[in-house]
Amino acid sequence: MNDSIVLKSPAKLNLTLEILDKYKDDFHEINSVVLNVNLFDEMKIKKSNRFEIYTNAEIDSKENLIYKAYQLLFERYGKLPTRVNLTKNIPLDSGLGGGSSNAANFLKGMNKLWSLELNKNDLKLIGNQLGMDVNLFYDPGVNFLEGKGNLIDSISTIPQGGLIIFYDDYRIPKKTFRAY
């Protein structure tokens, strides 16, 4: 039995984003074409004597989607003592989906590591409780999103060519960002 798993969590890039309306729950109705890109966070999950997360980034544990995903698994299965080593390469608060990608890959990894026998639909049901972007990372490639971003259709034609992503390290607090 394998007692550790190494995963790569890809970033995503919105090639298009159309905001159509705002729902009563403060989510927006959108149409978007999203592409997974070759920028990855690296995650190693290993059986341990307790649950712990180590990372090279300053992430508030209350906001950490890996921690929230673990809480959902704990409610269903009880203790699954696991050590998570996360190397962040996707910039925080950049809109590139790093946290959502990490959560999706953590759930996939835990499923395999602990033989939880969750199918893709089970994983997506858990993902829905974590955030609208999480389930996008169960269907890599190019996807069309609609609704709150939770209605996902794969696009079979993948754009050819390259992309260069520029990122300014200036972080906007979530409270300020949400105000706009």
Task: Label every PLM stretch briefly.
Residues 72, 76, 109-116, 129:
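Active-site catalytic microenvironments for nucleophilic, acid-base chemistry
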Residues 84-92:
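Membrane-embedded alpha-helical segments that form the functional core of polytopic membrane enzymes
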Residues 3-33, 116-180:
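ATP-dependent small-molecule kinase catalytic core of the GHMP/sugar-kinase superfamily
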Residues 66, 95-101, 133, 149-151:
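Gly/Ser/Thr-rich beta-alpha loop segments that engage phosphate groups in nucleotides
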Residues 3-80, 93:
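N-terminal beta-alpha supersecondary unit
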Residues 94-122, 136:
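DPxDG-like acidic metal-binding loop motif
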Residues 65-72, 102-105, 109, 126:
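Generic beta-strand or strand-like secondary-structure segments
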